[in-house]
Amino acid sequence: MDKMIHQLIEETVSSYLHPFQEDYKDQAFDFSIDSYFNGVEVTGYYKNEYKPDETTPFVLLRLSILHDCKQVHISNIFLPRFMHHRAIGKHMIGNIFGILKQQGYALFIVDMVNSFYCIMIGRGALPCIGCDDAVQIVDTTNLS
C-alpha cells in the first residue's frame, strides 16, 4: 500500500505536468520526480535567462507521506513566473487530493506563508487547530 501511494502521486503529477513541457518549450520547462520512503519531490527546470544554454533547477513540489496516520503534507509548491495565472498549482493540488482521497489519505498544505494561508482559507481549506501555517484540503476546497 505504501509504495502504491508513492506511485499514484508520481503518476498523477507526471501526467499532469507532461503537457506543460510542450506548452513551455520556449522556456525549456522540464521536470524530474524523485521518491524516497516518506516523500516525493518534483524538481522543475527552465531556461536560465542569463545563460540560455543552461537550465535553472527549482523545487516545484515537495511532499511528505505520513503512512501511519494516512496523511500527506505539501511543504513546498512553486512555479516560475511564466507559469503563473493558469491555475497549475491549484489543479495539481486538486489532482493529488483526488487520488489520496480514494486511498483514504488526508492532504495538508504546511509551512505556508501568511498570504497563501489566507488565500487557501478563503478557498475553503480547513485551518489546522493551534497552527497558523497549515490547512487541510477537503472536498469543499475550491481548487478551480
Regions of interest found by a model, annotated:
Residues 1-84, 91-144:
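Non-catalytic substrate-recognition and accessory regions of acyl/acetyltransferase enzymes
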